[in-house]
Amino acid sequence: SVFEAAALGCDSLSSNALPVTILQCGSAGLCDDLIISEYVEGTSNNKALEIHNPTPFDVDLTPYVMEVYNNGSETPIQSLNLEGVLVSGGVTVLGNPQAAAPIINQSQALSTVTWYNGNDPIVLRKNGEIIDMMGVIGEDPLGAWPVGEGAMAEYTLVRKPNIGQGSTNWLEGQTQWDVY
């Protein structure tokens, strides 16, 4: 939301001068790093990840790595070093190289990091530290990871609009998604 106000002296306001942007940054009010904002786990190879920059600054993607862990593994089976700059408020989409044309056409990168099937943890790291994740590394849920009224298999998950901070705790993180 954008509100405009200006101080006139000490006791009145005008509604036409100073634009102030109110960021939707979650309950803690922090938007200090990238987050996974959308997860697509569709039929066959129709899979994609969207990364969002909720910060007020453009972000160099060089220190970031996206990883996927398979079936309870403690080491990633696929990883992708991110490249470029993600503008403030912008998103980048990582698509499966064998996905249908609509996913491929919207992807800024095609990567095997999208080879997941609902029970595989997805991790976003910065300088080696986890800043956001879905699922739990080293655990196999014996099905798909639960998310709201759905799961990480055969659904599209979109981060709730009031979430501006990544989660490293899946018990908390699984409540941060709208399920489609």
Which stretches of residues belong to each language-model region?
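Extracellular recognition modules
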Residues: S1-A6
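Extracellular low-complexity, O-glycosylation-prone Ser/Thr/Pro/Gly-rich "stalks"
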Residues: E149-G150, Y155-Y180
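Ser/Thr/Pro-rich, low-complexity mucin-like regions
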Residues: A7, R125-G128, P161-G164
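C-terminal edge beta-strand
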Residues: S15-C25
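Short, exposed coil/turn segments at beta-strand boundaries within extracellular/luminal domains
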Residues: A7-S15
